[in-house]
Amino acid sequence: IPAFNGNTLLGLPQYIEGRVGVVFGTLYCAPKRLDKGKYPVRVYESPQEAHRCYRENLDAYHRLTDDHPDEFRLLLNRTDLSSHLSQWDAFINNSREAAPPVGIVVLMEGAEGVREPAEVEQWYEWGVRLIGPAWAGNRYCGGTREPGPLSKEGIELLERMADLGMVLDISHMDHQSARQSLDLYQGQVIASHSNAETLIQDIPINRHLQDETIHQLIERDGVMGIVPLNAFLDWHWRDHGGREAMSLDHVIAQIDHVCQLAGNTRHVALGTDFDGGFGVESVPSEIDTIADLQKIEPRLSEKGYNEEDITHIFSENWLRILENNLPAS
């Protein structure tokens, strides 16, 4: 929707060209109080409306994969994932193989669609494998632009998620509730699409992770997906030369910062948010489509990262999370 988002970075040919075999497919609806006509998405005013909206999102993924099984596939368990990766390996190693589908693991961004914590089990049965409790603040916890701790309901939500073996996503959670979650949650924790706050000069919102939180995430063997969005790399990018002044060096700096904090490459990956309401006009100048993420590899090599390091960052870290936390079958 160019009038809102700019020109898209995504398309099936670009997924294939960029060797993007697995993505987190996001369920998302906006709270009406924050919309103001800005976002071309469904909005809600109550938990019941949020539930309906998120369920419609999920149904859309099921229709997509049912109607186009050669192009998109839901990955619900380790058996699905293993079979899917084997197909991708065959394709990468033999160009004569037909292009495989893109695998989708469903992630709920903002838990307002969960009307009460006990309902998590129903969403799990429907195919949701990861939940980020916040987008903005809600009855479960503080979120972006709306700070606050975990509520009693939020703690119960985390307990229900842990019982099911779900992955907790702390992206968009407030600093306080994210750190609480890292202390309390008994399952796997990630930050699917967050950057290091310390590298974003003068950022006025609580959207990204402080180094203290990144250290906690590393201690919990979590993974943090770096977002190549200009405003999340330089808050004042429009004043500093616009898109043409933004380069992949900003992305590399974010990746390297997490690696330096960790002392290794096991805790950082890519979390593009390219389905998140922005287009090519808002990303570094070397990126025209998602396929251009491959340009990050030689830049990492130039900085001294070896082949194993780069494999961790591009695929193995996220795959470790999925292989360790998806149900067996």
Residue map of PLM features:
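N-terminal hydrophobic targeting/anchoring segments and the immediately downstream early-domain regions
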Residues: I1-A134, N138-K152, L199, N206-S329
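Loop-centered beta-sheet repeat module
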Residues: P147-L184, Q188-H193
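Aromatic-anchored, glycine/proline-accented short structural segments
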Residues: S177-I218
